[in-house]
Regions:
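Cytosolic, long alpha-helical scaffolding segments
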Residues: 1-203
């Protein structure tokens, strides 16, 4: 399910860079339905497993998995939003031309997604800790700065559609990054701290 969400995000970003055929974009949007289907299946399997085993020791693992599934599904939703941008934005969504900071956020989130998948599959605590460090500076603060500067009038674009596309894309990337952070915390945090900053780790 995480691989499917990752694949959808990568393709959504790639397709937004070129004026792709409308049918291709809509077909890719439908991948979100697959993610939603997997989410429902995982929930059913979790409930069935717990009902049959009735093992209290499994509760922690079950809650971790449930949290992770929700974050993965949300990433699929935001990837679908990126595809909507590609469909309705009249130009190619070239982040290098729109704003260098937006391009940097895009690259950071893409890299973090690759590494998050790896950290989850290998249960790599060191990699997970590394990913959590610098998240606020490289994603959250950078995204907020772009959005706030546009709203305040400090940052201007040639057209309203450019401004809107930049704001939306910055926000989508920020939210995807946040859900990736939540997923990463499942590797190192106890169940009550999933999605939150660990002590000693500066985000």
């Amino acid at each position: 399910m995480l691989d499917l969400s990752h694949n959808m995000f990568v393709k959504a970003v790639k397709k937004s860079k070129k004026q792709e055929n409308l049918s291709v974009l809509k077909e890719l949007k439908n991948r979100d339905k697959e993610i939603n289907k997997y989410q429902r299946e995982v929930r059913r399997k979790i409930v069935t497993h717990f009902a049959l085993q009735n093992n209290i020791n499994d509760i922690s693992s079950i809650m971790v998995l449930m949290n992770m599934v929700i974050d993965i599904e949300r990433i699929g939703d935001y990837s679908k939003n990126i595809l909507d941008l590609a469909i309705y934005y009249p130009e190619k969504l070239n982040t290098k031309e729109l704003h260098p900071d937006l391009h940097e956020i895009e690259q950071v989130v893409k890299s973090r997604f690759d590494q998050t998948v790896n950290a989850i599959k290998t249960e790599d605590v060191e990699l997970a800790s590394k990913l959590l460090k610098g998240f606020k500076k490289n994603v959250t603060t950078a995204s907020d700065r772009i959005v706030n500067h546009i709203i305040s009038g400090e940052l201007n674009f040639n057209t309203g559609s450019e401004s809107a596309a930049t704001v939306l894309y910055a926000r989508y990337l920020k939210r995807i990054g946040s859900h990736l952070k939540n997923i990463t915390t499942t590797v190192i945090n106890p169940i009550d701290s999933i999605g939150y900053q660990s002590k000693g780790i500066s985000t």
